[in-house]
Amino acid sequence: MYLKQTFLMIALGAMAMTAAAQASIDTQRQYLSGHGCDDMVNWDFYCTGGRNAGKWTKIGVPSCWELQGFGTYQYGMRFYGKATPEGIADEKGKYKYEFTLPQEWEGKQIELVFEAVMTDDKVTINGRKAGNGLHQGGFYRFTYDVSDRIFFGKHKNRLEVEVSKESSNSQVNMAERRADYWNFGGIFRPVFIVAKPAENIDRVAIDAKGDGHFMADCYLNRAVKGAKVKTEILDEKGKVVASNVADARNSDEAHVDFQTKAPKLWTAETPHLYTAVFTLQDAAGKTLHRERQKFGFRTIEYRASDGVYINGQKVIFKGVNRHSFRPETGRTLSKAKNIEDVKLIKSMNMNAVRLSHYPADPEFLEA
């Protein structure tokens, strides 16, 4: 019995060590906010104008602050075509939040990611400016490398964000805020920390054709000399159906190019998805970092004076215009609400969506 217990403890310890090692090579994520409107996290908040202004209180993040009882509701259409009109709501929101990070993340590349903020924002972490000090544009993900200004373990980190509802860039205002919809302010999509090994895959661009031809450009950060990228294609059951190894060119990019056999093709009615696993290795084959990305094999063609073909079959688009919006939560949605919209669109026998007039939540695109 004692030998069995000892063996079990050794086996469990080995499994734990293996799991930790696997996690250390994968990209890891820690949310500082909620994932959406259904699980917001309270941050300290101060609004400079409108309702409930002039005092520090709490606000759920992510959210549009108007829907949380702050600032001024304003519809954009009355200001259409006017760069700097009188009467525009221009309050600011100041956010503060403290958090800790795992001690084992020390030495990794640490990125602070905002999915979207309306509209201008200035970010500091532990009293130091993040990035160039100002991000503009309300619908785009932006990322700061904060590896050199972050603490680990029990030492708390302090995040401060100042958000301006109106942009100081008139072109941003004309493009985003002088239109036929509500103008909101706030950190309205999730905020999270990403941890990667110091040598890592920064991003990947995939081009997978309907004939099984798979290509990808892997952009690398601080890749060592002789680095290579191993690519594995997994089917829906997790089985490896194809693999390849590509050398990094100029040490900061690897081009993947190989053929797969008889893949199941993606269409609007049969959206077969595969998973590409990209593994960055050093010259000796040691794994440095691993990324995963879902994709579908498909070929899209436009034939002049004819139409659009997907995988050689002509497609008649039956679509709808869709805003990222709910009257209860503004532009802050959730995975459930995004899936709800997709199911509604499919129930109307539609096969296309116009994402007016800005990038949608990643969860909507993935649905």
Question: How should each PLM-predicted stretch be described?
Answer:
Residues A195-V224:
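Surface beta-strand/loop "capping" patches
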Residues A130-G131, V241, V315:
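Short hydrophobic beta-strand segments in globular cytosolic domains
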Residues T27-G34, V204-A205, V277-S347, E366:
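N-terminal carbohydrate-binding accessory modules
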Residues A21-R78, E162-Q171:
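Accessory carbohydrate-binding/adhesion or oligomerization-edge regions at the termini
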Residues M1-I10:
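Bacterial N-terminal signal peptides that target proteins for export
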Residues D26, T48-G49, D90-I201, A223, ...:
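Accessory beta-strand-rich segments of carbohydrate-active enzymes
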Residues A11-A20:
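Hydrophobic h-region of N-terminal signal peptides that target proteins for export
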Residues V123-I125, H213-A248, A254-V256, A276:
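Beta-strand-rich binding/interaction modules
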